[in-house]
Every structure is written in C-alpha cells, then in structure tokens.
C-alpha cells in the first residue's frame, strides 16, 4: 500500500498496475519528470471522452483545474514517477509510483491472449483493464526480460496493440497503425506521432507487418513517448521480423520534440 490523493486529501491506496479502488471507471497514466507532467491535456481529453460517453461529469482533476493538480502533485511529494489518475462516480484518485528504467530498443513477442472487444469505439481506457493485465501476466510467464513487449491480436488475427503500449510501423512511405476496429486504445503518444510524423497515415487490419521498414512501441511513460523495435517473435519465440532500430530515429526525434512542448510544471 502507498499514499494517494483522493478527492484532494491524502489517503491510503495502491497505485500499482492492476490494482484499482472499488468503483473505478476510467484511468490515465502520465509521466512526471523533473516536476513536470507530460502531455496532461492529451490524457485528459481521452479521459473526459470516456466520462462523457458514460454520462459522468468530470471532477477538478479530470477537468484539468491547475490548482487541483498543483495541490495533488504537491501532496504526493514527488518530482519523478508515474502518475495514475483513476476516476469513479464519486471520486478522483491520483497516485504516484516509481518510474522504472526504459529500454531504448524493444523486442516484440506475439501473445495468445486475444484483445477483448471494447465497450465502444474509440476504445475507452476503462478500469480495471483486466484484458491487458492478463496479457502482461502471459508475457511474464514466458520468462522474457524488461525489453520485451507483448503483442495482442483481435479475434480475427489482426494486430491490435501491445500489452502496455500502442504500435505503429513505417512501410512503403506511410505510417501504418492498427485500425480502431481491432480494439486498440487511441493511445496518446500514438495520436501525437500521427500528427507529427510527416507521413501519410493508414489505419489497417493486418497480421504481423513483415514488410515494415521500422516499428515503434509507443507509451506515454517512455522517454520521448516511444522506442524502436529490433525483432518480432511469434508466441513460441520463433522470429517473424527484424530490422535496424536506427531507421526509426527521425520519427522518434519528431515525437520527442512534439511532447517536449506539452509539459506542465506544477512545482
């Protein structure tokens, strides 16, 4: 157990992945670095879309009230970590956990845990996120290291997203992303990449993109919001794709520059 800020007051809680307070509806995870919250507005737009669709009004944190955020971040007392905002019908809970080191290059591993059907499209980031947690459990059971991200497919066999990340790849001069119909989340870092990559965008329903020139793992808590991929293996560990991670550098740099302009300090 740790301390969380619940409705503006410090309380006992648990901000670890997979642990949610009773009544949790939606959540967002954000990076806190050097006292600044990264891309807060992007996360809150997605959160409010879910609340609006479910018929709930946003509280001060979900509404982006600067004074509420400054107070909550101050109460938690950290300058670096992963902030998790969880909202329910009658509460907002902001927690802070450690920001673990992130690999510069990922290896992908196909998983057998299928992406479940979303409540609606575009998919809301709803608690308790049980399907992604099951995918993460499967990935850990394979005995892989921290530099491996699991990939979920929908029931038709199309690439959906990573167990903790969004996916995108460059192929034939275009940025390819899984279509929303695969059940993937509208990831915040993915949305930013779409806007700043400078490439035509194709939303696709496809299996493993074996002709991709570069593949990216996108996650809001990664430095710069993304990392490159070097290999993609099937569920049994057999190779499906490999590439030079350096080819992803132009898009990683563009995304990092975009995100650097969207940090808010509550110090």
Model regions: which residues?
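Helix-start/capping segments and mature chain N-termini
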Residues: 1-63, 68-71, 88-267
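Short secondary-structure junctions
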Residues: 74-81, 143-144
């Amino acid at each position: 157990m740790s301390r969380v800020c619940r409705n503006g007051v410090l309380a006992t809680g648990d901000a670890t992945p997979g642990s949610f307070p009773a009544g949790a509806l939606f959540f967002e995870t954000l990076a806190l670095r050097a006292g600044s919250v990264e891309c807060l507005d992007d996360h809150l737009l997605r959160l409010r879309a879910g609340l609006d669709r479910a018929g709930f009004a946003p509280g001060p944190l979900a509404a982006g009230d600067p004074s509420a955020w400054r107070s909550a971040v101050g109460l938690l007392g950290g300058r670096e970590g992963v902030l998790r905002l969880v909202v329910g019908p009658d509460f907002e809970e902001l927690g802070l956990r450690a920001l673990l080191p992130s690999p510069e290059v990922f290896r992908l591993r196909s998983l057998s845990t299928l992406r479940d059907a979303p409540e609606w499209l575009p998919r809301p980031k709803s608690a308790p996120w049980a399907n992604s947690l099951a995918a993460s459990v499967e990935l850990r059971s394979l005995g892989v290291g921290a530099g491996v991200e699991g990939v979920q497919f929908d029931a038709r066999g199309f690439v959906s997203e990573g167990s903790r990340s969004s996916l995108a790849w460059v192929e034939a001069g275009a940025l390819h992303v899984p279509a929303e119909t695969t059940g993937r989340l509208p990831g915040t870092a993915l949305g930013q990449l779409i806007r700043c990559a400078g490439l035509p965008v194709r939303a696709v329903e496809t299996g493993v993109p074996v002709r991709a020139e570069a593949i990216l793992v996108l996650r809001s808590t990664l430095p710069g919001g993304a990392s490159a991929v070097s290999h993609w293996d099937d569920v049994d560990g057999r190779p499906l794709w490999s590439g030079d991670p350096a080819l992803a550098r132009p898009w990683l740099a563009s995304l990092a520059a975009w995100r650097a302009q969207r940090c808010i300090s509550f110090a």
